[in-house]
Amino acid sequence: GMSEEKRSPGLGVGLMLVCAVLWSTAGLFIKSVPWNSMVLAGWRGLAATLTLWLFMRKMHYRVRIDMRTVLIGLCVSGTSILFLIANRLTTAANAIVLQYTSPVFLVVLSMLIFRRRYRAADYVTVIITVCGIALFFFDQLTPGGMLGNILALIDGVTMGGVYLFTGESDEERRLSGIFLGLAVTTAVGIPFTVAYPPEVTVTSVLAVIAMGVLQL
């Protein structure tokens, strides 16, 4: 209804700030675990999937599968995997900053898909962010850094998609979508363990579990 429309921008910004803090700690965690990106995505996904599953059981939510939850799921798994790969290729700071382009893509996608109208302030934010991204790109002209930047930008798009599709859904569908995304990430990532056996140390295992639980 109207009240939800009114309330969402402020709430969204708050959520993004919380996310910002979590993702920055993620950047540090990722650097501390010397595993292959896909292996890391898979095991972290497993920890997150189990945490969310326990939470959904407690709340008596079912995992619903429909067009919207699948879209959320694809965006969630895209975001997790791209963030990890980008983090390896570019500096953690770059990957995180570029991932914060997601509000820009959120505004653009929702204008295209939901024909949303925005306030002037939102457009200003978009323009400033775009200028910031341009600076980042010209700063990192090394091929690896560049590829990492591009992946981190696509990551911004998928993250914008997560906010876009979850923003329009009720709690059960929102969590179902996130659950599907984490499950996909787990299924895609864990098989890489065979090709790239990780160094299993207490530190790395704890870091992966912490990442899985916190990243929710």
Which residues fall in each region the model found?
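Glycine-/small-residue-enriched transmembrane alpha-helix faces in small-molecule transporters
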Residues: 1-39, 71-74, 82, 131, ...
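Specific transmembrane alpha-helical segments of multi-pass solute transporters/efflux pumps
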Residues: 22, 57-94, 98-99, 131-135, ...
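Small-residue-rich packing faces within the transmembrane alpha-helices of Major Facilitator Superfamily
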Residues: 24-25, 42, 46-50, 104, ...
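Specific alpha-helical transmembrane segments that line the substrate/conduction pathway
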Residues: 39-42, 46-47, 84-116, 155
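Juxtamembrane helix-start motifs in multi-pass secondary transporters
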Residues: 40, 174-178
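Hydrophobic transmembrane alpha-helices of multi-pass small-molecule transport proteins
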Residues: 52, 74-76, 108-111, 118-138, ...
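Loop-to-transmembrane alpha-helix entry segments
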Residues: 63-69, 96-99, 115-135, 139-149, ...
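Membrane-interface helix caps and helix-loop-helix hairpins in membrane proteins
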Residues: 85-90, 138-146, 168, 195-202
